[in-house]
Amino acid sequence: HDQKSINDIGIKQSIQNLIKKLILNALKNNVFGLILAPKDLDIATKIKKNITIFVPGIREKKTRKDEHKRSLDSLSAVKKGATYIIIGRPITKSKNPERTLKLINKKIKNYLKKN
């Protein structure tokens, strides 16, 4: 979603404020983890460190964004605090899904080894 789609359903606050309120409410109710759009990772990690965060909407830099308006590439999502990234179409619709997955995996492993 983007700000316009949020406003269209009658919510007049910013996406950032809405996400912050939802995260705080979830944490107050002892959730196991959060499912967040990639662009919302910064909000969550400022509120609480070491929480499990599932992130769908991953799109590599050279792939189509499809309907995702607030996506990030896999490495950026990991760097911003994603615990689990959920990647569908960029892998399943690629010409070589196995190669695509291996490239993503290698990129993330290399980053994690250094950090």
What are these regions (language model features)?
Residues 23, 41, 74-75, 101:
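Generic hydrophobic/aromatic pocket-lining and core-packing "Φ" positions
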Residues 26, 44, 77, 88, ...:
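Conserved, mostly hydrophobic/aromatic
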Residues 35, 85-86:
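Conserved beta-strand positions in the central sheet of alpha/beta enzyme cores
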Residues 55-56, 87-90:
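Glycine-rich beta-strand-to-loop/alpha-helix junction loops that act as flexible
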Residues 66-70:
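Short secondary-structure boundary/capping elements
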Residues 78, 91-115:
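C-terminal helical cap(s) of enzyme catalytic domains, especially alpha/beta-barrels
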